[in-house]
């Protein structure tokens, strides 16, 4: 906003600002705001493309409407909820053998004479 000069009165400055505000509100000052719906449309199309990539089972070569994409997303979310609601599988019923560190990497086992160097 410009500073008010003593030559130009306050009333004149306020009128100028209010006319500019009305022009913007009525749409005469179309600039970047006019491009906004197009950028929103591009963003939405990008989001639908991203959903198509993320949801498994969507055929690559077929055209799907936005409603079909959303329906597949909803079905996928419901499938995930069912899987998460199932109880986790327990340990196997067979014999459980503990893993011995010495069997896997003997160099990791510290002998008593080497422990004295640590303290």
Curated annotation (Swiss-Prot):
Subcellular compartments: Nucleus
PROSITE patterns attached to this UniProt entry: BHLH
Transmembrane intervals: none
A single MF term (Gene Ontology): protein dimerization activity
UniProt GO BP: cellular response to leptomycin B; central nervous system development; circadian rhythm; epithelial cell differentiation; heart development; metanephros development; muscle organ development; negative regulation of DNA-templated transcription
Alphabetized Gene3D superfamilies for the sequence: Helix-loop-helix DNA-binding domain
Role description: Transcriptional regulator (lacking a basic DNA binding domain) which negatively regulates the basic helix-loop-helix (bHLH) transcription factors by forming heterodimers and inhibiting their DNA binding and transcriptional activity. Implicated in regulating a variety of cellular processes, including cellular growth, senescence, differentiation, apoptosis, angiogenesis, and neoplastic transformation. Involved in myogenesis by inhibiting skeletal muscle and cardiac myocyte differentiation and promoting muscle precursor cells proliferation.
Subunit structure: Homodimer, and heterodimer with other HLH proteins. Interacts with COPS5 and COPS7A. Interacts with IFI204. Interacts with GATA4 and NKX2-5. Interacts with ANKRD2; both proteins cooperate in myoblast differentiation. Interacts with CLOCK and BMAL1.
Protein name stated in the entry: DNA-binding protein inhibitor ID-3
